[in-house]
């Protein structure tokens, strides 16, 4: 049973309808009794049932259920938690409803994206992501393997139309070029990314109602050969391809002491008031020696640091309790390495310190110390740190923290940094490191970008019509600054390779052959011919750039030079 505020759902799964009917009725009766005793009522008008079944051509009996004296009506589809669920889980009605809502939002982008006076591309993409993509993202992992592929294709069409309007591109523009130019991944890859992130989060919380449905072996194996595999089967395949060991994800932890009962932790950020980028290292070192060290004169000093280089992570500790250099899982983030260092020194303090001992931990990770200070982190390693700190407080052992800038000549910090770097060259102990699920998000991003890059290269190699691939062999975004909307649109069209001047023949007749350049009549008209090769514009071109190829032009010269050439050549309103 799921309960969300004042909505709840009861569900059962079985091969026999009679068993489901009996179990549902028992639970409905229990809920009715509880509500009567506690002064609540369940609205029978808003209570419905759905019988989920496969369309195998057989008759499926609908259960007969009662809420009090009222018969519960069964419907073919119903909206719950923002998704429209139908009896065969095709999600056809949900996607149809989603398209209707998104098309209304698309009208806003149409108004804002006028090519002469509209908003800039960056702002339009923000509006698109806030109004349309957010709706497309919600619950998308549920219907990512929808039965009717045409429904998913309809979403792709709307998605592409919104991107095209943001860029000011023509309808003839290659689809993959639109994605790369806008730095907006295809919906198929977007759904995979969101599904994997969702899976990581659920894996860290075994108490979540969907955990067993997604990760129990029997759940995965039972759908192994399904034509339309559920999310559990898809996730298992995705994590395997991305080489993400989901069994090593740390389990969500609840603090031993409730947050409202925890004693606050002392964290000093006095040196953080100075901007490191504009402050001399000698000033930080002098300030540390004159202000910080005297304040902690009767404390035992401990220095910690984390390091990550070439996908290898380690941490180091320097203190009178001993030095430590230790390598940890390669999937660890630098944030995790810093936390592991602090966790290790606290364990050492706990095992060796006496009552009323005083320690100060110097660390150059501001984000880790902020998490220790606000005590609201959900990171399992950080919760372990906070639990150890509360235990030390009960034993009258004082531990305070102080932020110090890195690489400014503070002796203890430099030695801890050396220990961390030395740890990079050690071997990992034969131990399964359980990491926070957030540490695997970069691997998800890397995997999705890899799929996108393969798709980008494959499309170019197969069709050879994606002109943008010559400028952008990788999917890295191209940034445009300080241009008007009209100028931005021109640059986007030139980069994509489809302009009014070069492709208007397609708008007139899709079967018409590409014409020759009307200015020199020596070659087929194209963006490359106009910007690089056409002899008619050679003198004007030499005033602004001397590039030998389109890639050289867009890599070396600011877009404003290209715009000035287009204006002087009299082509500004023809692009």
Regions found by a protein language model. Name each.
Residues 1-17, 35, 39-51, 76-87, ...:
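Catalytic palm active-site di-aspartate
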Residues 6-8, 31, 35, 49, ...:
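Mobile genetic element proteins and their domesticated derivatives, centered on retroelements
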Residues 8-33, 54, 370-374:
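Catalytic palm subdomain of template-directed nucleic-acid polymerases
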Residues 8-10, 14, 145-151, 189, ...:
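RNase H catalytic domain
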Residues 26, 40-76:
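Short, conserved micro-motifs composed of acidic
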Residues 69-142:
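Basic, alpha-helical interaction scaffolds
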Residues 280-354, 372, 380:
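RNase H-like nuclease fold core
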Residues 290-294, 300-307, 432-524, 546, ...:
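Helix/loop segments that flank and initiate small ligand/metal-binding modules
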């Amino acid at each position: 049973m799921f309960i969300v505020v004042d909505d709840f759902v009861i569900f059962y799964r079985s091969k026999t309808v009679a068993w489901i009917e009996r179990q549902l009725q028992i639970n409905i009766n229990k809920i009715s009794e509880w509500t009567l005793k506690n002064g609540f009522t369940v609205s029978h008008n808003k209570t419905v049932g759905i019988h989920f079944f496969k369309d195998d051509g057989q008759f499926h009996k609908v259960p007969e259920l009662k809420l009090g004296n009222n018969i519960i009506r069964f419907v073919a589809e119903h909206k719950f938690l923002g998704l429209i669920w139908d009896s065969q889980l095709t999600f056809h009605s949900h996607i149809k409803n989603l398209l209707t809502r998104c098309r209304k939002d698309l009208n806003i982008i149409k108004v804002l994206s006028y090519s002469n006076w509209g908003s800039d591309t960056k702002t339009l993409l923000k509006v698109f992501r806030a109004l349309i993509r957010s709706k497309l993202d919600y619950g998308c992992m549920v219907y990512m393997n929808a039965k009717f592929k045409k429904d998913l294709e309809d979403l792709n069409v709307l998605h592409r139309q919104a991107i095209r309007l943001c860029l000011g591109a023509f309808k003839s523009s290659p689809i993959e070029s639109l994605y790369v130019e806008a730095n907006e991944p295809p919906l198929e890859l977007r759904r995979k990314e969101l599904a994997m992130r969702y899976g990581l989060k659920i894996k860290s919380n075994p108490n979540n109602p969907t955990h067993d449905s997604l990760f129990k072996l029997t759940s995965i194996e039972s759908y192994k050969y399904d034509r339309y595999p559920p999310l559990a089967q898809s996730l298992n395949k995705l994590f395997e391809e991305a080489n993400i060991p989901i069994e090593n994800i740390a389990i969500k932890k609840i603090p031993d002491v409730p947050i409202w009962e925890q004693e606050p932790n002392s964290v000093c950020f006095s040196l953080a008031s100075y901007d490191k980028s504009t402050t001399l290292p000698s000033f930080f070192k002098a300030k540390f020696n004159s202000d910080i060290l005297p304040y902690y004169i009767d404390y035992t000093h401990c220095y910690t640091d984390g390091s990550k280089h070439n996908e290898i992570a380690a941490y180091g500790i320097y203190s009178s309790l001993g030095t430590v250099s230790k390598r940890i899982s390669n999937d660890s983030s630098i944030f995790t390495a810093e936390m592991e260092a602090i966790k290790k020194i606290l364990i050492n303090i706990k095992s060796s310190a006496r009552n009323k001992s005083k320690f100060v931990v110097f660390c150059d990770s501001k984000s880790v110390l902020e998490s220790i200070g606000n005590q609201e982190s959900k990171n399992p390693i950080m919760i372990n740190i906070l639990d150890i700190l509360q235990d030390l407080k009960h034993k009258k052992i004082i531990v305070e923290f102080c932020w110090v800038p890195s690489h400014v000549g503070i002796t203890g910090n430099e030695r801890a940094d050396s220990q961390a770097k030395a740890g990079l060259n050690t071997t990992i102990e034969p131990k399964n490191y359980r990491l926070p699920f957030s540490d695997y998000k970069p691997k998800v991003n890397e995997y999705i970008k890899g799929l996108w890059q393969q798709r980008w290269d494959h499309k170019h190699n197969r069709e050879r019509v994606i002109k943008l691939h010559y400028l952008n062999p990788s999917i890295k975004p191209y940034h445009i600054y300080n241009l008007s909307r009209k100028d931005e649109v021109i640059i986007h069209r030139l980069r994509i390779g489809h302009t009014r001047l070069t492709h208007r023949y397609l708008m007139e007749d899709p079967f018409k052959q590409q014409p020759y350049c009307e200015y020199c009549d020596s070659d087929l008209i194209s963006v490359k011919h106009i910007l690089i090769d056409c002899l008619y514009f050679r003198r004007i071109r030499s005033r602004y750039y001397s590039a030998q190829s389109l890639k050289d032009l867009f890599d070396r010269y600011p877009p404003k030079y290209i715009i000035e050439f287009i204006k002087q050549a009299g082509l500004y309103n023809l692009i």
